Amino acid sequence: MAKKSVIARNEKRKALVEKYAAKRDQLKKAGDYEALSKLPRDSASCRVRTRCVLTGRGRGVYEKFGLCRQMFRKLALEGKLPGIKKASW
């Protein structure tokens, strides 16, 4: 489980990205890089980390499911992910 402060910081960054998305696109199209650099750093989408929705883990996350590899495996084996089954051949 990731620290709550790390998860909260990432949520704050997501909110800033959403807040400044339109302004950022407008400045990029205009080519006003000086004004773009004056926006908050955390409003850039590259600062947001994809995290597991259950544990907050930041590595090994499947974006399609929003789960880290451990939780994905656990839930898939329990049959809680519809349409997912273990491969065998």
UniProtKB/Swiss-Prot annotation:
Pfam families on file: Ribosomal_S14
Gene Ontology molecular function terms on file: rRNA binding; structural constituent of ribosome
GO cellular-component term (any): cytoplasm
InterPro entries hit by this protein: Ribosomal_uS14, Ribosomal_uS14_bac/plastid, Ribosomal_uS14_CS, Ribosomal_uS14_sf
Record PROSITE patterns: RIBOSOMAL_S14 (PS00527)
SUPFAM superfamilies the record matches: Glucocorticoid receptor-like (DNA-binding domain)
PANTHER family membership: 30S RIBOSOMAL PROTEIN S14, SMALL RIBOSOMAL SUBUNIT PROTEIN US14M
Function: Binds 16S rRNA, required for the assembly of 30S particles and may also be responsible for determining the conformation of the 16S rRNA at the A site.
Subunit record text: Part of the 30S ribosomal subunit. Contacts proteins S3 and S10.
Similarity-based family: Belongs to the universal ribosomal protein uS14 family.
Name of the protein in question: Small ribosomal subunit protein uS14
UniProt source species: Chlorobium phaeobacteroides (strain BS1)
